[in-house]
């Protein structure tokens, strides 16, 4: 009889755990994996980025700089925001502003549902030749209001079309043109192209940095990036 008394509570405990697991999973956003997002991306030969093909590449710095830093990032990624604050800004000062290197920014929106409009916004901003201003404004907004304190809002729908349009206006863009660009998904194929490139480059997480064709594995300090760039410049 003692066994029966032991088994019954265990069965009840099992049901309770199953119930709370189900409820917990229902509270979580339905997150697609990076691999899923990469595979779902479709490129189109009729991409409407702009008639100026040079604007299809999102560049920070002098396009003719000797060294190219490819940065794959998601504006909703906490580590991308941390990289921007702790490494990216210093790289800009020491290498980008001095025209020694340039950053080619590639979107990889997979964290949350609002990652995608934020990514497409980079190309909308680039239409107005204000990609860098938009890029910096969105990262600063996320860091100052959220990720500087904690990462708990990672999956919340923060970067709505309305919020992105507001930030674009603060960055000096024409809000009406920007909003229309986002609303019509004008640059969907441009972001899909970024995702396809990320798959080809073996990107499995963000941020993912490539310096002159060589991937930098794992999170690194600023001094590590500085050393790698100095070697590339020799």
Where are these predicted regions, by residue range?
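Cysteine-centric redox/oxidoreductase cores and disulfide-bonded domains
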Residues: 109-206, 210-234
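Extracytoplasmic thiol/disulfide redox context detector
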Residues: 1-110, 180, 187-200, 230-234
């Amino acid at each position: 009889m003692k066994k029966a008394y032991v088994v019954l509570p265990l069965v009840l405990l099992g049901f309770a755990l199953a119930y709370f697991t189900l409820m917990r999973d229902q509270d979580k956003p339905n997150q697609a994996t990076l691999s899923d997002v990469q595979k779902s991306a479709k490129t189109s030969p009729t991409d409407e980025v702009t008639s100026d093909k040079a604007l299809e590449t999102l560049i920070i710095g002098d396009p003719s700089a000797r060294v190219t830093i490819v940065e794959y990032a998601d504006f909703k990624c906490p580590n991308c925001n941390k990289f921007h604050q702790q490494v990216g800004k210093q790289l800009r000062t020491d290498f980008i502003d001095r025209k020694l290197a340039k950053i080619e920014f590639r979107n990889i929106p997979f964290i949350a549902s609002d990652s995608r409009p934020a990514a497409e916004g980079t190309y909308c901003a680039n239409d107005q030749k204000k990609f860098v201003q938009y890029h910096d404004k969105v990262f600063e907004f996320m860091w100052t209001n959220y990720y500087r304190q904690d990462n708990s809002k990672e999956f919340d729908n923060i970067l709505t079309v309305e919020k992105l349009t507001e930030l674009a206006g603060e960055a000096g863009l024409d809000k009406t043109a920007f909003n229309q660009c986002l609303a019509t998904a004008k640059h969907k194929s441009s972001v899909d192209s970024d995702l396809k490139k990320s798959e080809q480059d073996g990107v499995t997480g963000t941020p993912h940095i490539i310096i002159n064709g060589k991937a930098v594995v794992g999170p690194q300090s600023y001094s590590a990036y500085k050393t790698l760039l100095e070697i590339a410049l020799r």
